[in-house]
Structure formats: structure tokens, C-alpha cells
């Protein structure tokens, strides 16, 4: 098993407060000349799974098993917010994030000359994107769960998706409430959580007596929660694998999201190729100055 530095939100807050985050530098020139500080998501993160697949950082061994080649030098963060905070505080850092979760604290890079925007994802020119899925136990959904899902997939729910910077589904239908009470527990991906929170807020305006509880973790935990019944709906920012699908759950796409490669705002780099990103995250390229060679 690979060993990485692991950062949680609490750890980041403490380290940033005293300015000793491992590998960080306050010299802005280091962002384009010094060592590249890789920041990755944790194993189990759907964003990490999609990122390593789309950039070729993952391969299969002779047994057909997937192998993640993310560099051992990477600092691992346990949520989208920690990823963005870590990169924003380290001039030498590079990481990745859900497009819909981005904020102004980091700089978004072009990939192969294309912008990480909804427009370019829709046109197909920016290819680093993945589905947002909800995961449910087939045939076991409670009436309140079905109603909330109907809202997510409706015109109203998809309008929330689009308003928050994600790509909505086509041909959504009008929502009609079918229940007036109940509770829905939702668990999983920290990338899906922000838009799910917004959907929950909008849903409560039309069906206030249904209690919706959202528990943030990661995609794998969300899928497991749907499988074992501890959650009514799992959130996953990746597709189900064969093992998961065989356990009686199904995935339903609720939106499409891009994955943006991000650096510190002091960094002078604006554009990387797919190969350059792969070489950085696998540890082949370790210095910012190597990118200009």
C-alpha cells in the first residue's frame, strides 16, 4: 500500500495558521521554478478515480486489476474543500477539483489548450469530465426517497444543477409531489455534496415535511452505505464497478461535472497537456522548470 501525507480540514487549518505546511514556500518564484508539490484526493474518492483514469495515471496489471500510479510524494486530502485550501496556500502545489466546487482561491489551468468550462465540456472540446451519480438499492426505495429522486431529475431539480455550474440532464419533466412526509438519508461524495445541498434547499421549499439528511464522505463510502442500507441514497462522482453493481444497487446520473486541474494563483503556468499532467502526478516530472524543457 502506498504511503502519503494525509491532510484533513483540521490539519490544514492548523498548519496554515503557523505557515509550516510540508513543502510550502512563500517565495512566489518557487511556483514556476521549484519542486512541484502534488496534492491528490484520498483513495475511495470518485474524483480521484475519474482523474487517474482520464489522465492515464491508472493502468491494469497482468491480473487485470487496476493500479493507481499516483506518486508516493503526493499529499493526500480528504475532501474537495481541503484540496482547494491546500493548493491556495502553497505556491508550488498542483491539484484537481470538481468544476462545480471551484472558488476564486485557486487558478484553473487549461488542458491541451481547452478551458475547464461548462461550454467546452458540452462541446466536447474539454474532455476531463465525469457523471455525478446517485446510487440506490433496486426495488427497495422508500416512497420519500422516490419523491426526492423525482425532484432531482425534474426541471426544477435540473435548474438547480445548472445554476450551480454543472451540466444538467436533457428533457427533464415537471415535478409533482407524491408524498407529504418521510425521511431520506443521503451519503457519499464530497464533490456531489455541494449541489445536493442546493437541491435539498430547493426541494424543501416545495415539500418541507420530508426530512433530507446529507452525510459527506467519499464515493466509495456512499456506495457502500446504499448497499448496506445505512443510507437511502449514495452519492458517487464515478461509475459503479462490477463488484458494486452485483450487490443489488443501481446508479442514476443526475448531472455531468468537469474535473479542473488547479494551481496556486501565484503560479505562472497557464496550460498543460494531458501528458504533462500525467507525468507530474506519477512523479516523472518533479520540477516546474522541467515543464519548459
UniProtKB/Swiss-Prot annotation:
Q: Record's Pfam families?
A: PBP_like_2
This protein's membrane topology, according to the annotation, is:
Lipid-anchor
| Lipidation feature positions (S-diacylglycerol cysteine) | 24
Which InterPro entries does this chain map to?
PBP_domain, Phosphate_ABC_transporter
What parts of the sequence cross the membrane?
none
Lipid anchor (N-palmitoyl cysteine) at which residues?
24
Gene Ontology biological process terms from the UniProt entry: phosphate ion transport
Q: Show the Gene3D superfamilies listed in the entry.
A: Periplasmic binding protein-like II
Localization, UniProt:
Cell membrane
Q: How does it assemble?
A: The complex is composed of two ATP-binding proteins (PstB), two transmembrane proteins (PstC and PstA) and a solute-binding protein (PstS).
Role played: Part of the ABC transporter complex PstSACB involved in phosphate import.
Q: What is this protein called?
A: Phosphate-binding protein PstS 2
This chain's source organism reads Streptococcus agalactiae serotype V (strain ATCC BAA-611 / 2603 V/R)
Amino acid at each position: 500500500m502506498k504511503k502519503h501525507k494525509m491532510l484533513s480540514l483540521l490539519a490544514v487549518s492548523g498548519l496554515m495558521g503557523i505557515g509550516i505546511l510540508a513543502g510550502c514556500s512563500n517565495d512566489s518564484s518557487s511556483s514556476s521554478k521549484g519542486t512541484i508539490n502534488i496534492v491528490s484526493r484520498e483513495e475511495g474518492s470518485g474524483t480521484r478515480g475519474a482523474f487517474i483514469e482520464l489522465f492515464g495515471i491508472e493502468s491494469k496489471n497482468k491480473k487485470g486489476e487496476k493500479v493507481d500510479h499516483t506518486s508516493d510524494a503526493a499529499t493526500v486530502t480528504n475532501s474537495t474543500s481541503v484540496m482547494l485550501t491546500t493548493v491556495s496556500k502553497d505556491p508550488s502545489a498542483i491539484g484537481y477539483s470538481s468544476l462545480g466546487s471551484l472558488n476564486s482561491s485557486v487558478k484553473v489551468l487549461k488542458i491541451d489548450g481547452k478551458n475547464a468550462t461548462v461550454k467546452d465540456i458540452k462541446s466536447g472540446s474539454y474532455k476531463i469530465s465525469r457523471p455525478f451519480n446517485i446510487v440506490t438499492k433496486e426495488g427497495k426505495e422508500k416512497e420519500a426517497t422516490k419523491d426526492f429522486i423525482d425532484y432531482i431529475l425534474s426541471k426544477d431539480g435540473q435548474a438547480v444543477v445548472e445554476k450551480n455550474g454543472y451540466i444538467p440532464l436533457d428533457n427533464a419533466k415537471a415535478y409533482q409531489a407524491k408524498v407529504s412526509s418521510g425521511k431520506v438519508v443521503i451519503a457519499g461524495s464530497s464533490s456531489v455534496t455541494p449541489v445536493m445541498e442546493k437541491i435539498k434547499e430547493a426541494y424543501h421549499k416545495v415539500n418541507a415535511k420530508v426530512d433530507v439528511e446529507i452525510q459527506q464522505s467519499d464515493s466509495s463510502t456512499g456506495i457502500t452505505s446504499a448497499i448496506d442500507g445505512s443510507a437511502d441514497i449514495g452519492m458517487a462522482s464515478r461509475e459503479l464497478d462490477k463488484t458494486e453493481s452485483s450487490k443489488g444497487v443501481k446508479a442514476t446520473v443526475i448531472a455531468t461535472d468537469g474535473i479542473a486541474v488547479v494551481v496556486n494563483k501565484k503560479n505562472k503556468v497557464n496550460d498543460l497537456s494531458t501528458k504533462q499532467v500525467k507525468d507530474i502526478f506519477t512523479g516523472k516530472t518533479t520540477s516546474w522548470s522541467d515543464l519548459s524543457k
